[in-house]
Amino acid sequence: MTKSELVEKLAARFPQLLLRDADISVKTILDAMSDALADGHRIEIRGFGSFGLNRRPPRVGRNPKSGERVLVPEKRVPHFKAGKELRERVDRNLTPSSGGSGNGHLTGTPSGKGPQGAAPGSPAVLHEGGGLNLARS
């Protein structure tokens, strides 16, 4: 699901909300979440999950062109952990007929191709029946 699809879904669910206002609402929420993470805070949405930061320590890497050793500095990377209710809902809806491979992975194959051959990095697609196809690498 893309941000614009989320905006459209929000506007459809609340007819009194103009599309412009739904867009502003989604942007405001995402900005607030991004700001909180950038400031080092954890975000918890009960029943959905939590967003936090993982620390990647500094390491020695290699420049792929020259083979030269390069010091890669420490990084903080966002991390999402699904809540119990979300995990149970996803597990309950993951059946072979809904596009899942039945092995617990949404990508379907080790090559990273999705159930319908979607390329890695493709956005999640939420279907009217509630099914979610997600291609990820």
Swiss-Prot record:
Which GO cellular component does the record give, naming just one? cytosol
Q: What CDD domains does its record include? A: IHF_B (cd13836)
Q: Which GO terms describe its biological process?
A: DNA recombination; regulation of DNA-templated transcription; regulation of translation
For the keyword DNA-binding, the answer is yes
Q: Biased-composition ranges for Basic and acidic residues?
A: 75-92
- Return the Gene3D superfamilies for the record: IHF-like DNA-binding proteins
Chain spans, region Disordered: 75-137
Composition bias type Gly residues, residue spans: 128-137
GO molecular-function terms, A-Z: DNA binding; structural constituent of chromatin
Query: Which of UniProt's keywords are assigned here?
Result: DNA recombination, DNA-binding, Transcription, Transcription regulation, Translation regulation
Organism domain of life: Bacteria
The task this protein performs is described as: This protein is one of the two subunits of integration host factor, a specific DNA-binding protein that functions in genetic recombination as well as in transcriptional and translational control.
Record's subunit section: Heterodimer of an alpha and a beta chain.
The record's section on NCBIfam families has: hip, PRK00199.1
**Into which family does the record put it?**
Belongs to the bacterial histone-like protein family.
How is this protein named in the record? Answer: Integration host factor subunit beta
